[in-house]
């Protein structure tokens, strides 16, 4: 369903409308931070994002054009991640500290940390009493204190 018309997406909407043309846009965690520029939807339709600054695209967000003729659903892409766990909560906290000290993005869950797969990080983690497992999962890192979002 490729259209020749230039599709400019400008707004977030709260609910998925029943009528209109719907497109899906699958993005990784880095791409979900960029609110402006050209993108290719899952069906290879080029769109232009011109969203207001100061936000972030989230899994399930619905975007629309000014004329509300087109809607784009944001889908979080599955990424290669490292799942970090430990029997010691203190060791997990120390690991989180060292990852943060290196400005590594981390998703924090109840008993695990998740970060993007990287051999340098994996080598660093060998110095801690943690278990690491390579997994495929959607990644939702914490927003940092110095975030510009």
Curated annotation (Swiss-Prot):
It is found in: Cytoplasm. One of its GO terms (cellular component) is cytoplasm. It comes from the Bacteria. The keyword Chaperone applies. Gene3D superfamilies: Urease metallochaperone UreE, N-terminal domain (2.60.260.20), UreE, C-terminal domain (3.30.70.790). GO terms for molecular function: nickel cation binding; unfolded protein binding. It holds the Pfam family UreE_N. Its main location: cytoplasm. Involved in urease metallocenter assembly. Binds nickel. Probably functions as a nickel donor during metallocenter assembly. This is Urease accessory protein UreE. It comes from Prochlorococcus marinus (strain MIT 9215). The lineage of its organism: Bacteria, Bacillati, Cyanobacteriota, Cyanophyceae, Synechococcales. The gene is ureE.
């Amino acid at each position: 369903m490729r259209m020749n018309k230039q599709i400019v997406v400008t707004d977030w909407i709260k609910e998925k409308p029943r009528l209109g043309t719907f497109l899906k846009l699958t993005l990784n965690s880095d791409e979900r931070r960029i609110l402006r520029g050209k993108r290719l939807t899952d069906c290879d339709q080029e769109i232009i994002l011109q969203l207001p600054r100061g936000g972030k695209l989230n899994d399930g967000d619905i975007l629309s054009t000014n004329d509300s003729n087109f809607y784009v659903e944001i889908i979080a892409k599955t990424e290669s991640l490292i799942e970090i766990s430990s029997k010691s909560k203190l060791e997990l906290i120390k690991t989180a500290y060292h990852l943060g000290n290196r400005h590594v993005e981390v998703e924090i869950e109840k008993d695990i940390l998740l970060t993007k797969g990287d051999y340098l990080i994996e080598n660093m983690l060998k110095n801690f009493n943690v278990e690491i497992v390579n997994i495929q999962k959607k990644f939702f890192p914490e927003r940092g204190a110095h975030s510009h979002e």
